[in-house]
């Protein structure tokens, strides 16, 4: 009894003094906090303003992303305030960087509505990124408790079911984005789809910004694209698909387009990240109900994920999108034209594909994560890749990926079908070499040259793009190892 009185007295004297007191003193810092299995954990990279103690800055982030405001409020006493306060429990300096710190924060599960990415993000990234106490702030990683994950649907279809529907096993999926992304008529667009699929690709896809413009309305695109899919499937004797982008201005429009895509026989539809978390979850629920694969283009992500000191690491987006329920997400190529450190991208892929992940600091995984049996998301590698890189792509990314060669198919001098054939032959020759036990990474260029002896389109592709690489040092690399972007 005496301890209870003493505890209440301490809380009242330290936590509920009127006016403005430090966040750490208000209880948002607790170095002795014992993490619960049901806690949501977040890791922030903080850059405090000059003169701001990193512990106080961490406590401020914990407070402002949970229950605090700038001054003490007596209405906290009407809540289970000790439970609901987020707790910053650990602060580490960032290796080899001055004035940056990793702040570990724990949130009670009851702070979040079940099954809502929108509610989760309203707290975790809602106000704190504009907080004056920090010069910059970045959300690096999160751990979701199993109890919380069980309130989410997860991927509508998942990798295993997609492979069964497509009847494609033992190799990556092959795809391409229609180019140019804007300006084609419906008939010409459908011709591109047909040529690419007939040449050997599994998928063609719309790009992120093709919706329903004056040069080609959405229904026209859907009809001509599916005509191409059906003709190519019949000619090749394989199951083929085209990602029909149903992104639109309103949910009503997206529903209409998605339902029409189903009516005309598509097995997959597509949305953009920019439609927002609630719309993404809504379309994922629709996709599962209608047995459709749901592809997500990460349009817009680099506006907040690329810079190392402020914004949000893409691995967090990967986690949220697996919870939200998409089946595909663009997650980097390593060797292509877009940002992508090898270790960082490996961390993204593991986040999307593994049932459990352990702490792996070189890959940027700060927490162990049990995915509570949520289905796997298929990563998509797209942007500046070509047949001559096939050994690198297979080595870095493995089998469970969609390799999308847009320009690397449609830019082929002998035509779209030839470009698709070059990519299919390159992939199958590399997979065969791997399955035979050869060192396909070291022997990759020779394996491709040998395959090209009986495949003219592949020889043309190798000659055309042999000197093309995008070997820049990534802006976002692991803090615990030096890993320049590799393009051998």
Swiss-Prot record:
Cofactor: Mg(2+)
Active site: 179 (proton acceptor), 297 (proton acceptor)
E.C. number(s) listed in UniProt: 4.1.1.39
Predominant localisation class: plastid
UniProt keywords, alphabetically: Calvin cycle, Carbon dioxide fixation, Chloroplast, Lyase, Magnesium, Metal-binding, Monooxygenase, Oxidoreductase, Photorespiration, Photosynthesis, Plastid
GO MF, any single term: monooxygenase activity
Complex formation: Heterohexadecamer of 8 large chains and 8 small chains.
Annotated protein name in UniProt: Ribulose bisphosphate carboxylase large chain
Higher taxonomy: Eukaryota, Rhodophyta, Bangiophyceae, Bangiales, Bangiaceae
């Amino acid at each position: 009894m005496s301890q209870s009185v003493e505890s209440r007295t301490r809380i009242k004297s330290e936590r509920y003094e009127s006016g403005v007191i430090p966040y750490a003193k208000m209880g948002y810092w607790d170095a002795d906090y014992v993490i619960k299995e049901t806690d949501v954990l977040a890791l922030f990279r903080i850059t405090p303003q000059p003169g701001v103690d990193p512990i106080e800055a961490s406590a401020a982030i914990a407070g402002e992303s949970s229950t605090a405001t700038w001054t003490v409020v007596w209405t906290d006493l009407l809540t289970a305030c000790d439970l609901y306060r987020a707790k910053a429990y650990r602060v580490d300096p960032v290796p080899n960087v001055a004035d940056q710190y990793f702040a570990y924060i724990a949130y009670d599960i009851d702070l979040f509505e079940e099954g809502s990415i929108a509610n989760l993000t309203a707290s975790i990234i809602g106000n704190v990124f504009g907080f004056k106490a920090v010069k910059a702030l970045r959300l690096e990683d999160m751990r979701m408790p199993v109890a919380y994950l069980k309130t989410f649907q997860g991927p509508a279809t998942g990798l295993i079911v997609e492979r069964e529907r497509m009847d494609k096993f033992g190799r990556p999926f092959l795809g391409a984005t229609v180019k140019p992304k804007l300006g084609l008529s419906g008939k010409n667009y459908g011709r591109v789809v047909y040529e690419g699929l007939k040449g050997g690709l599994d998928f063609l896809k719309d790009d992120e910004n093709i919706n329903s413009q004056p040069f080609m309305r959405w229904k026209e695109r859907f009809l001509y694209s599916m005509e191409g899919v059906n003709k190519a499937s019949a000619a090749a004797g394989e199951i083929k698909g085209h990602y029909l982008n149903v992104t639109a201005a309103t949910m009503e429009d997206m529903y209409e387009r998605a339902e029409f895509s189903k009516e005309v026989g598509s097995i997959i539809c597509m949305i953009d990240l920019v439609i927002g978390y609630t719309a993404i979850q809504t379309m994922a629920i629709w996709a599962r109900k209608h047995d459709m694969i749901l592809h997500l283009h990460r349009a817009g992500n680099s506006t907040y994920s690329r810079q190392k000191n402020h914004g949000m690491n893409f691995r967090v987006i990967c986690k949220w999108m697996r919870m939200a329920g998409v089946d595909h997400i663009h997650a980097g190529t390593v060797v292509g034209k877009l940002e992508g450190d090898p270790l960082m991208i490996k961390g993204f892929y593991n986040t999307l594909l593994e049932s459990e992940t352990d702490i792996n600091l070189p890959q940027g995984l700060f927490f162990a994560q049990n995915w509570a049996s949520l289905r796997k998301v298929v990563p998509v590698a797209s942007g500046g890749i070509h047949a001559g890189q096939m050994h690198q792509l297979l080595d870095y990314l493995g089998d469970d990926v969609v390799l999308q060669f847009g320009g690397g198919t449609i830019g082929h001098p002998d035509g779209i079908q030839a470009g698709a054939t070059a990519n299919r032959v390159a992939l199958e020759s590399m997979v065969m070499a791997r399955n035979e036990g050869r060192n396909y990474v070291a022997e990759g260029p020779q394996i491709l040259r040998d395959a090209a002896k009986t495949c003219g389109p592949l020889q043309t592709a190798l000659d055309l793009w042999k000197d093309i690489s995008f070997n820049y040092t990534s802006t976002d690399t692991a803090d615990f190892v030096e890993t320049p972007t590799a393009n051998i």
